[in-house]
Amino acid sequence: MPDKTPFHRAMDELDALHAADPRRVEHEGASLPHELWHAGRMSAWLKRVVEAPGELVQLAVRSQHLQRWELPRSAYPEGRVGYLTWRRDQGKRAGETTARVMQAAGYSASDAAAVASMIRKQGLDRDPGAQAVEDCACLVFLESYFADFSKQVEHDHLIRIVQKTWGKMSPRARELALELSMSEEARAVVEEALSSG
């Protein structure tokens, strides 16, 4: 069997890191590490958002939540500032770790830096890779987390969150989001947000 490519070496190492997540999720009758499942959902959406995505975008999308459990949201103050600081720190950590994994697998420092930038979602308006990461993250949120999340958040705040999420998505991601299967309650929130946005 030929040696693995840098891409496959990096993906294998990233998935090994994902698999270390102690949190579990039940999926199709199997118990999986939560982060490995999340990474799989991100990659699955990428195939629908971007036609023939390149290796660097695939690595960025796969790593967006890398080792997120190691820095819990509860370690930061409540409220918007605490949330934004936590999210920024998570993106920085995930980008740095992914860059190290990539270089160890044989990628150049410039390719590793480009992926780290995509993970931090820098330049959404000018970097298609960063936009792909954002699109996949928004779609995974709407598909897998929104129904439960919507029960924990005050209605008007939830409407604003949906509007902000929608505003960050590309036209293709919005099209895919409208095709999602949702509960009646979740669908009503999305429709209200879009009609009043």
Task: Name the predicted role of every residue range.
Residues 12, 96, 100, 140-141:
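Generic structural signal for well-ordered, non-membrane alpha-helices
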Residues 55-78, 94, 98, 117-123, ...:
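His-Asp-centered metal-binding catalytic motifs of divalent-metal-dependent phosphohydrolases/nucleases
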Residues 26-30, 80-87, 127-128:
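A ubiquitous short alpha-helical element
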Residues 74-117:
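Helix-adjacent hinge/juxtasegments
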Residues 2-9, 16, 29-36, 40, ...:
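Divalent metal-dependent phosphate-bond-processing catalytic cores, especially two-metal-ion Mg2+/Mn2+ enzymes
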Residues 18-27:
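Short domain-edge segments at the starts or junctions of modular domains/repeats
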Residues 34, 38, 49-58, 86, ...:
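Generic, well-ordered alpha-helical segments
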Residues 43, 58-59, 112-120, 191:
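Short, well-structured alpha-helical segments
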